[in-house]
Amino acid sequence: MRARRGFILLLLLAVLCSTGVSLRCYNCLDPVSSCKTNSTCSPNLDACLVAVSGKQVYQQCWRFSDCNAKFILSRLEIANVQYRCCQADLCNKSFEDKPNNGAISLLGKTALLVTSVLAAILKPCF
């Protein structure tokens, strides 16, 4: 009975962890009106980008380590850019909006996971 309960707990944790990893970003290139298209980023793209060059607006999934002007300019093949990268779901709505703090959200999920695992491990001891 105890082994079965442990297995169910591990299965539940695996499901919860896998659903919390995927980042969602707005994904539009120069929308005519407000961007409403969003997509789930692949695991190697861990940030959302909003970049503005003149009237051109780019909103897409991005790699946070590549979030610098030099890389963005070369990748998007543009001459100048204002940009912002953020790491929370749908945080790249527009350039003017303040981003949500994805780091706090990630820290909270990690703390919850660690607490749950420790509780499951220590429960048989008490």
UniProtKB/Swiss-Prot annotation:
Keyword Zinc in record: no
Domain UPAR/Ly6 per the UniProt entry, residue ranges: 23-110
In the record, which residues receive a covalent lipid, type GPI-anchor amidated asparagine? 101
Kindly list the GO CC terms recorded for this protein.
Answer: cell surface; compact myelin; external side of plasma membrane; extracellular space; plasma membrane; sarcolemma
Q: Which residue numbers fall in the propeptide?
A: 102-126
Q: How is it modified after translation?
A: N- and O-glycosylated.
Which pairs are disulfide-linked?
Answer: 25-48, 28-35, 41-61, 67-85, 86-91
**Would you list which residues are glycosylated?**
38
Fetch the Pfam families from UniProt.
CD59
Where would one find the signal peptide in this protein? 1-22
Subunit description: Interacts with T-cell surface antigen CD2.
Protein name as annotated: CD59 glycoprotein
Where does this protein come from, organism-wise? Rattus norvegicus
Q: Taxonomic classification, please? A: Eukaryota, Metazoa, Chordata, Craniata, Vertebrata
**GN (gene name):** Cd59
